[in-house]
Amino acid sequence: SVGFKAGVKDYKLTYYTPEYETKPTDILAAFRVTPQPGVPPEEAGAAVAAESSTGTWTTVWTDGLTSLDRYKGRCYHIEPVAGEESQFIAYVAYPLDLFEEGSVTNMFTSIVGNVFGFKALRALRLEDLRIPPAYTKTFQGPPHGIQVERDKLNKYGRPLLGCTIKPKLGLSAKNYGRAVYECLRGGLDFTKDDENVNSQPFMRWRDRFLFCAEAIFKSQAETGEIKGHYLNATAGTCEEMMKRAIFARELGVPIVMHDYLTGGFTANTSLAQYCRDNGLLLHIHRAMHAVIDRQKNHGMHFRVLAKALRMSGGDHIHAGTVVGKLEGEREITLGFVDLLRDDFVEKDRSRGIYFTQDWVSLPGVLPVASGGIHVWHMPALTEIFGDDSVLQFGGGTLGHPWGNAPGAVANRVALEACVQARNEGRDLAREGNEIIRAASKWSPELAAACEVWKEIKFEFPAMDTL
């Protein structure tokens, strides 16, 4: 007789282990599971653990050649989701040895690679990951981090200001460079390539890099401040991406940019390592994130993508605004903003944080607030994001009736007024409008901006609720 029984078996016999004590080296995952009708939650949770680690749908004789106990993922806890019918949070522990060191790509291929198409589940969402120090220590992380960036730029005690150059597509390189120069001269710290500006027929990347570098050095000479423009190095191949980053370094500019989800984690990690070795800051745009994170019951929450970026490497990442035109619930947004910036973040379910996360010494990432924001939002943004952030006003700079430079002046004046008011102990949430009005009395540029945007609001209920 054969030594094992073939045939389909219940996952929960092997992979549901409620008595398991998690190890400090385990990677822990919280999945929101919606089983098909008739599938018990324990079986669904165990199936997730199995299919994202060692399991397959039947017993195979090669199981006898390894130690499943050592390598299997385990579903160790299941709880119903309050207010949702037939949704559960399944907690899964993965042994560290299942993952290649220093590879976000491999971590995601394992944890979310296959299991999301699993038939026994109606839907599946990865809500959070606990990355143990034993694993984070195999990553370089952000090229420089918050403190080193401030030292490089010599800018302290306030959020940094940026602006995405619009119209995003169609400008020639020279006109584009001119728009960059006007914004930087007016008082912004950074300007930005739009995420879809790569190297198109109307503006090839090399021309753009040259004209933007000229704009940076001219505005630096005039203002006495260090300036930057996020030169988008994203390209169709990794080799071409590196070529663009190398050219940026040769021009002597301070920062480049990458679309980390469309470009991919492998490309992003290579670029981040190049940036650290060559003193370039790295701005990360999250184009495509909403495809993955917008649905409440399926996909991956952005806090997981944010943690992955901190491991793969980036000095800035877009993180929603809480107040502008794009998605972002306040407490949840602040939860992943802290996961990006802080060394140690306590578990706090009210902010969507399922696990205590200890980053040890991995550098932090500056969150970027961008999308439909303008001068009237400045007090709220200063209050919500604090000093360690980048506030980006695209239309909110370039839409100024007098042009880009006055638009930049208006934003800088508004920001300095808010920071000063906060440092004097005033309550930005309550007195914000008053602070902006007072500042606009002595800044005609700000007064004009206040007039243009006084009525504009983007008010829709947020999808991203707990």
UniProtKB/Swiss-Prot annotation:
Keyword presence, Oxidoreductase: yes
Source taxon at top rank: Eukaryota
Active site: 166, 285
PTM description: The disulfide bond which can form in the large chain dimeric partners within the hexadecamer appears to be associated with oxidative stress and protein turnover.
Catalytic activity: 2 (2R)-3-phosphoglycerate + 2 H(+) = D-ribulose 1,5-bisphosphate + CO2 + H2O; D-ribulose 1,5-bisphosphate + O2 = 2-phosphoglycolate + (2R)-3-phosphoglycerate + 2 H(+)
E.C. designation(s): 4.1.1.39
Annotated Gene Ontology cellular component terms: chloroplast
Binding site for substrate: 114, 164, 168, 286, 318, 370
Top class in the EC scheme: lyase
Entry binding sites for Mg(2+): 192, 194-195
Cofactor binding, note field: Binds 1 Mg(2+) ion per subunit.
One GO MF term: monooxygenase activity
Site (Transition state stabilizer): 325
Cellular compartments annotated: Plastid, Chloroplast
Residues where N6-carboxylysine is found: 192
Record keywords, A-Z: Calvin cycle, Carbon dioxide fixation, Chloroplast, Disulfide bond, Lyase, Magnesium, Metal-binding, Methylation, Monooxygenase, Oxidoreductase, Photorespiration, Photosynthesis, Plastid
Note: The basic functional RuBisCO is composed of a large chain homodimer in a 'head-to-tail' conformation. In form I RuBisCO this homodimer is arranged in a barrel-like tetramer with the small subunits forming a tetrameric 'cap' on each end of the 'barrel'.
Function noted in UniProt: RuBisCO catalyzes two reactions: the carboxylation of D-ribulose 1,5-bisphosphate, the primary event in carbon dioxide fixation, as well as the oxidative fragmentation of the pentose substrate in the photorespiration process. Both reactions occur simultaneously and in competition at the same active site.
Membership in a protein family: Belongs to the RuBisCO large chain family. Type I subfamily.
Name of protein: Ribulose bisphosphate carboxylase large chain
Organism: Vitis aestivalis
